[in-house]
Amino acid sequence: MKSTNRSTVAISLFLLLSRSPSLFFSSLLPFSSSTMPTRFQKVLAHGTTMLDVVYTNESREVSFFLEQLKEKWLDAAMDHEKFLGLDLEYTADQRGVAVIQLCFTRHVLIFQWASSDKHFPELMDFLRSGITFATVDIRNDKLKMRYSFRIEIPTGCLIDIQTVFRLRHVRTSMAHMVVALIDEEYGDM
């Protein structure tokens, strides 16, 4: 790996997973009905990092994940590691939120918002709580969160990885960032 910063690697892996259907989503997306089962999976990322992934549309699983996140993982982390990866995926017409993804070190929540009952006060409170989130190109996600959830994440609580790692292009794609920051092998995906 080109970067040894564990937090950078975790966020980069999260972003890679969130944008690369060939890696992960194609194996999960067959469950699109409102009765889809919650799935807990271990996913090997980059050959050496095992991720614990929860894929669900159930409020109790989201609540449990957030509780674990706050009480076990986030509180135990060093201050410079207290941020989460955040990404939204959209419906085919780009008008609605389909999936909300959160990642912290090796823990990933993939919450299928589109097939849920859309009543998750714990999740909305968590997103508003002042935790720092890292993402790539937050512009569209901020708009969707504002209009879909009435959530405004303060500017000081957002890290846009594109502005942290100034690469060759002003708005470098996530794929180019992963190749430059993690490993050139990702260029073939």
Predicted regions and their residues:
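Short, conserved beta-strand segments within well-ordered enzyme catalytic domains
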Residues: 83-89, 101, 109-112
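N-terminal accessory regions of nucleic-acid-interacting proteins
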Residues: 2, 17, 24-84, 88, ...
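A short alpha/beta connector and helix-capping loop motif
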Residues: 93-107
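Acidic, Ala/Val/Gly-enriched low-complexity intrinsically disordered segments
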Residues: 9-10
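Structural signal for hydrophobic/aromatic residues that build the beta-strand cores
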Residues: 86-87, 100, 134, 178
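Active-site-proximal helix-loop-helix substrate-binding element of RNase H-like nuclease domains
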Residues: 37-55, 106-113, 117-121, 126, ...
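Short, well-ordered loop/turn elements at secondary-structure boundaries
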Residues: 79-80, 95-96, 127-130
